[in-house]
């Protein structure tokens, strides 16, 4: 591993530790039981709050993950305050994001099949930035093109048909 990669890994692990400390304080204040798991995935720190009873963490997820998104931003700010650098840390609670990622991948694959069958673009429902990235990644893996359209919170992914080159 090069020194640059080792330095980046160390920095991301530090981000995870700072985030874990912040989130442990939050759990104490909210009187919630949970464990913090820290990892580095896809070039970013990844932190998850897990519990023996995942339903006990529902309040930290909120409807459609709104509270989770807010907590992620607050956690990123806590990391930035400590390190002086912007964080791209990902926070998951009780597997909510992992489950949503799988759902979005399935929805995207179904939409890709419709695009290929009809030759017409397919617009997906509005999603948050994390979910849109999941969709864009699946579309790219399948060799098609996608774009985002609209303004938050109604921003959506559009999957485009393959362009024929006239042959």
Regions found by a protein language model. Give the residues of each.
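RNA-contacting regions in translation and RNA-metabolism proteins
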Residues: 1-167
């Amino acid at each position: 591993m090069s020194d640059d990669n080792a330095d980046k890994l160390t920095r991301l692990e530090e981000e995870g530790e700072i985030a874990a400390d912040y989130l442990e304080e939050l759990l104490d204040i909210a009187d919630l039981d949970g464990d913090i798991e820290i990892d580095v995935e896809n070039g970013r720190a990844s932190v998850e709050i897990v519990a023996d009873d995942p339903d006990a963490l529902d309040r930290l997820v909120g409807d459609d993950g709104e509270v989770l998104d807010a907590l992620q931003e607050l956690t990123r700010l806590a990391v930035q305050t400590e390190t002086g650098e912007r964080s791209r840390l990902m926070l998951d609670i009780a597997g909510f994001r992992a489950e949503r990622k799988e759902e979005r991948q399935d929805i995207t694959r179904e939409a890709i099949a419709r695009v290929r069958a009809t030759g017409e673009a397919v617009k997906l429902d509005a999603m948050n930035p994390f979910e849109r990235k999941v969709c864009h990644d699946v579309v790219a893996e399948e060799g098609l093109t996608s774009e985002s359209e609209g303004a938050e919170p109604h921003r959506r992914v559009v999957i485009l048909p393959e362009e024929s080159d006239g042959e």
